[in-house]
């Protein structure tokens, strides 16, 4: 409560990966044992790093660093050789590929969509109708839109960027974020004690907005 509602008629999936310098001794996921990996605290990069590394390392060997800032700051730290490994997504993911950094492990992940508890449901649906149209345009001709990544980046990198090499990034999936997704995700997070003090008591029905679509979904 107080953190918004889960929009249950869509979710998104983002390409993501753990990157290291091209000359790093880290070449396999197993080489990441006890190596600090820069991630965002209680974010997609946090969860996806654990999820992707679990088949390769014990929990005691997974070393997450939360002290390296937000997405672009973490990217800068890797470029400046201030950190050994970073989990990156969106534009920074493609920029690392362009610059020749080594992707050690794919950590692509699914994201729920949160909206304000005060938001009008009709306004939310109009917003997502526009997003659906935009997603279709990107699916059809992504090369027409990758130049917009440049606007997100720190000024120091813009002249280096070749956005013709970039991919579509996060993709919105217009399918229900189901009760199964909700329950499985909560159970996974709870098992790993990621949230101190627990996850709260809200049920799926209490947490979501846009129930009309779900009622018509078998």
Whereabouts are the PLM-identified features?
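Conserved C-terminal helix/tail region of periplasmic/extracytoplasmic solute-binding proteins
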Residues: 190-218
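Ligand-binding cleft/hinge of the Venus flytrap
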Residues: 46-68, 97-98, 146-151, 191
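Short glycine-centered helix-capping/turn motifs at secondary-structure transition points
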Residues: 2, 81, 100, 192-193
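Pocket-lining segment of extracytoplasmic ligand-binding domains
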Residues: 66-152
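Secondary-structure end/capping motifs
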Residues: 121-198
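A local structural motif
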Residues: 54-69, 73, 80-83, 193-201
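Short, glycine-/small- and polar/acidic-enriched structural segments
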Residues: 1-59, 84-88, 103-107
């Amino acid at each position: 409560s107080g953190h918004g509602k889960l929009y249950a008629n869509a979710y998104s999936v983002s390409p993501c990966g753990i990157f290291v310098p091209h000359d790093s001794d880290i070449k396999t996921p197993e080489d990441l044992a006890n190596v600090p990996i820069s991630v965002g605290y209680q974010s997609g990069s946090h969860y996806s790093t654990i999820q992707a590394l679990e088949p390769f390392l014990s929990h005691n060997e997974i070393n997450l660093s939360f002290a390296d800032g937000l997405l672009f700051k973490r990217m800068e730290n890797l470029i400046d050789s201030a950190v050994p490994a970073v989990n990156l997504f969106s534009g920074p993911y493609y920029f690392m590929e362009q610059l020749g950094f080594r992707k050690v492990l794919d950590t692509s992940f699914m994201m729920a969509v949160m909206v304000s508890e005060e938001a009008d449901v009709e306004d939310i649906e109009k917003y997502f109708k526009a997003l659906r149209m935009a997603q279709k345009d990107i699916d059809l001709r992504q090369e027409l839109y990758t130049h917009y990544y440049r606007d997100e980046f720190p000024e120091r990198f813009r002249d280096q960027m070749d956005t013709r090499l970039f991919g579509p990034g996060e993709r919105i999936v217009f399918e229900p974020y189901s009760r199964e997704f909700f329950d499985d995700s909560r159970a996974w997070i709870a098992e790993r004690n990621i949230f101190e003090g627990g996850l709260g008591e809200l049920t799926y029905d209490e947490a979501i907005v846009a129930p009309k679509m779900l009622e018509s979904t078998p």
